[in-house]
């Protein structure tokens, strides 16, 4: 199982006079102000890759925080005003210099992945909200001046409820049309549950759910400490499983998805959060959500 957690570049945070990882919304807003005042307009405490591509982190936290989302039945139980509040919350992070406006990010990077952007590599973007299995990808991308500052942060509780969620990071299955069922089952057993296979797999696709496989991978030193640390924090915070419709490609597709359209419209100034609500709800209803 995997989920999202915050990663921070404490090298940059220290330059801004901040010595501890953000643990609250107040900490994030204070960091945005400190970065702008002490480091300049082109330094930001964090980036939400989820806004332009797959915003399956902050919005569910807003929903669950209010006790309004039902990830089991894919029913949207919140009002237009409440989802506007969620969109306005994300906009407030841009307005508070916590993260870069998407227009500026696209101008500098086009559709380049965040960990490959110059801003991340050089520490100008000093945080990311990402999958626990991606820890080493973001750590190894930093240049030599910033690499030692990479830190697995804490989940930030934005309200009365834990908004964390998890999903399967990788699953293997045998199809009904498989012509070699026994052989396929043997391969899955080898990769996930047997010593040699589990030692090869390690934590490359996330922390193994198999107790036997995890034990073999740990004994072989194949479980990366950063990934294990991040996963433990995510699982301790998680209260919900990911709604399977939330990652529907019509919603999350890069360049064409509803999520990107909504946040682009807000960040480019074409719509207010209140005006963007109908487009988001219409898009979610079109893929199977029930609007209560």
Language-model-derived ranges and their functions:
Residues 1-20, 48-73, 95, 166-174, ...:
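Periplasmic solute-binding protein
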Residues 1-12, 44-45, 155-164, 240-249:
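A structural signal for short loop-to-beta-strand junctions that line the ligand-binding cleft
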Residues 31-33, 75-108, 156:
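Glycine-centered hinge/linker elements that transmit conformational signals in sensory
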Residues 96, 142-209:
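Extracytoplasmic/periplasmic substrate-recognition and gating elements
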Residues 129-138:
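Beta->alpha turn/N-cap motifs
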Residues 153, 202-260, 265, 292:
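Long, aromatic- and glycine/proline-rich binding clefts that accommodate carbohydrate-like moieties
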